Amino acid sequence: MLVFFIHGVTIRTNKYANELMDKITEDLSKRGQQVPIFYSSRWGGVLKNTPQLWNWVQQDLNNFQKNSKIDIGDVFQYSKYREFFVSHFFNDLFTYLNLDYGWEIRKVIALQLLELLEKYPNENELHIVAHSLGGVILWDILFSEKFKSDDPAFYIRSVIKGLAESKEKESKQVSLNSITTMGTPILLFNLMLGISPENLKLFASKYEKPLRWVNIIRSSDPLAYPIQASFNIDLPSKLYLRDKYIGSRNLWKKSAPHLGGLGGLAIAHGLESSHTSYWRKSRVSRLITANLIGDCAAIDSANPFKLDWF
């Protein structure tokens, strides 16, 4: 069993999934299951030379303050919220949507997946876990119909059964048994990508067993959205698709109004933490573990607030 991680925004190292791997390993060991082979792909390095948009915004704001006595908060409100979305999401997202950078990112992911398959030629089962923008990239790679014939996405499709016919009889192909997405805005960005859910259904129909897709949403993550209704999946079918929620008590209802100016800063940091915390949550690792081994009963019974539901 191979488990391939695809990270989301702001990640620039390959250790982002280590804590989650440890939790999954522990969960599998408790269940008497064999530990899979993990691989943390890393495409963030492609973005190291791209401009940091918020630096330009901050420079303009500083220049404004030098020449004006007006409080910057009166002419540019919610700056901490804006900084969060620009620095921690939009910067990487719109860079991926750039044709050249997007091609390069898909190339990096393709080469890393091919490296993994070459290193473990006897493994026939692939599972993909994608976070944030990584989920959007995965959706794009697997099912977009807009790429040119030489796009790296087709290298990935060529090694996954059901996505493309292998051109060589001896070519290695693996079965994609499960997908787990975490904190991903596929719902929003598919309006731009224009990918038909029918492509997913067609792919899933080529497998004897249902393809499992668990989409995990943390309650306070503003970038995470359910996808089941938008995909219009006729359940039961060859696709097992579940939106699963990770709950948390909404303390901001009572505390935010009393924080004054600190409220915006605190909430901005809270939003960032909510979006990145999937890598550290035991409830997330348990859902992934259940998805890896096909324990659909455990997935369906998962309680948003309880850790030990199985």
Show which residues each predicted segment covers:
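Lipid deacylating catalytic domains
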Residues: 1-59, 91-129, 133-310
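Extended, charge-rich helix/loop segments that form flexible
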Residues: 63-104, 133
